[in-house]
Amino acid sequence: MNQPVMQGVPALNVPAYVKHARLVAWVSEIAALTKPERVVWCDGSQEEYDRLCAEMVAAGTLKQLNPAKRKNSYLALSDPSDVARVEDRTFICSQKQEDAGPTNNWTAPAEMRQTLNGLFDGCMRGRTLYVVPFSMGPLGSPIAHIGVELSDSPYVAVNMRIMTRMGRAVYDVLGADGEFVPCVHTVGKPLAAGEQDVPWPCNPTKYIVHFPETREIWSFGSGYGGNALLGKKCFALRIASTMGRDQGWLAEHMLILGVTSPEGKTYHVAAAFPSACGKTNFAMLIPPAGFDGWKVTTIGDDIAWIKPRQDANGQTRLYAINPEAGFFGVAPGTGEKTNFNAMATLKENVIFTNVALTDDGDVWWEGMTDTPPAHLTDWQGQDWTPAIAKETGRKAAHPNSRFTAPAAQCPSIDPEWDNPAGVAIDAFIFGGRRSTTVPLVTEARDWTEGVYMAATMGSETTAAAVGQQGVVRRDPFAMLPFCGYNMADYFAHWLKLGDQLAKSGAELPKIFCVNWFRKDEQGRFVWPGFGENMRVLKWMIDRIEGQARGDEHVFGVSPRYEELRWDGLDFSAEQFAKVISLDAQAWQQELTLHAELFAQLAHHLPQALPEAKARLEARLQG
């Protein structure tokens, strides 16, 4: 292929296996704008990964961990100003403001492009531009889509190799004219000739920008996680949700798990929870005592792409894939007791970010073990001891510290996790963290009622005082920070999809709402959670099979005490009543809060939701 020659821009050195002229022209255009010192086309090989990691170790960005403790694993410590997603600097630049809706930040696309062109002009001087091709989902899957990220961060290149199917094989799928989502990322810290780099370059000015109509992502100023690994939330949720709206499918902030009965029948569920509600723990659940022969397997812990198609019997079903190939998990709180499978996944080939370093070259974080080591180097590179922590309250690991680990290493990984066809979804589960009001589990009576439950779900942001409800942050479908278009239109999309499926005679998944976090009068959790959540999962399967009647109440159907399997757990009918009960007064208050959410979204809100609310109110007043 002819190599474009440009003034002051390095040779593109396009590999012969890249046959996509539009892609090459785009790389050339971005290189001309950002002016890197060189362009490197990532091939996704182990050799390339090892070389980039070695270069980052030499630069002080990574520290290699003790191979006897964590084989082929590294620790990165970020700049203290660059530790999390920046929601206030995240923009959806649709042509019309109303298409972004009231829950997203919006700027007119032409104005934003002008801003970005100024910021990106020369932003990669002295650095390498890495061309990172990746498939979200198994290569060639009808549910998968391809992206290419141009980044000046080798940290991004190596993390993308773990988190996605990244490398040369992507170009085989892309061919000469395949579709791809263009993603441009810079840490925003150009280097002058001879200037010494810092271990974690970033810029106080940050922009994470999505152009839904042209399916583009531009990210400036952050090297961290979801701001920089653009396949994750930016593509897999914000851009993909708009693709799903336009093309008739779903991109969801959901785990996917499989449940296999002792008889060998497997069911698949997709579940949405806001942060701090135990999503990864649920995805990797280990069945408790009393469930011999049952098996739970993990397909994904964070994102599901779901498309309708016919099964072998000609029945339309919803099929889901995990578009990712790795876990980008929050480290604190992950330990052998809370998530054995996650800990087993982290034994080798992991990149840790902002956790603490032990004196023998391993990692540690709060919640990993009951007793912390006597001495650590904390996430900011400072000495840390339990005494210092007691005195100052300083954490050894940052609360949002992370691990990037290959999904294939997870002991509970589902044999179908890499199946290009996806798995048929039998049920959707939605849940939040509520100390009162919301029962342990409720099944929606129909699709619209299920969408209503998901649209109004939320989590408490403060610990509720006794007799008071905490402040509830609504997080519809756990998608509030991640929906790439108007949230009210998103509700309408779910309703429309359900309607279309029902009209085609499709088998609709059941919809359940759960809450593991009810508290008693003393403020203690009543439900034991973790592996015991299997008991609720089993009841859902019984409902799918028509084997459990449940009790119908104002808001749907919940289990009777005797319908849950209690073998191996001492949990009384009185305790069960505390987690399943409905308080009419609390629910009147709750419905008032639902009205506030609907008022915020009134402009595009589908009429079916206020109608569902009116039916609930009528039942409540009964």
Swiss-Prot record:
Binding-site list for Mn(2+): K233, H253, D302
Keywords (A to Z) from UniProt: Cytoplasm, Decarboxylase, Gluconeogenesis, GTP-binding, Lyase, Manganese, Metal-binding, Nucleotide-binding
Catalyzed chemical reaction(s): oxaloacetate + GTP = phosphoenolpyruvate + GDP + CO2
Segments for region (Disordered): 395-414
E.C. designation(s): 4.1.1.32
Cystine connections: none
Chain coiled-coil ranges: none
UniProt main location, coarse: cytoplasm
Family as reported in the entry's similarity comment: Belongs to the phosphoenolpyruvate carboxykinase [GTP] family.
Domain of life: Bacteria
One Pfam family hit: PEPCK_GTP
Protein name (record): Phosphoenolpyruvate carboxykinase [GTP]
Keyword GTP-binding appears in the UniProt entry: yes
Pathway note: Carbohydrate biosynthesis; gluconeogenesis
NCBIfam families referenced in this protein's UniProt entry, alphabetically: PRK04210.1
Binding site for GTP: A276, C277, G278, K279, T280, N281, R402, R433, F530, G531, E532, N533
MF (Gene Ontology): GTP binding; manganese ion binding; phosphoenolpyruvate carboxykinase (GTP) activity
Cofactors (names): Mn(2+)
InterPro entries xrefs: PEP_carboxykin_GTP_CS, PEP_carboxykinase_C, PEP_carboxykinase_GTP, PEP_carboxykinase_GTP_C, PEP_carboxykinase_GTP_N, PEP_carboxykinase_N
Subunit structure, as described in the record: Monomer.
GO cellular component: cytosol
Cofactor binding summary note: Binds 1 Mn(2+) ion per subunit.
One record GO biological process: oxaloacetate metabolic process
Catalytic residues (UniProt): C277
Residues holding substrate: R85, Y224, G225, G226, S275, N400, S401, R402
Function in brief: Catalyzes the conversion of oxaloacetate (OAA) to phosphoenolpyruvate (PEP), the rate-limiting step in the metabolic pathway that produces glucose from lactate and other precursors derived from the citric acid cycle.
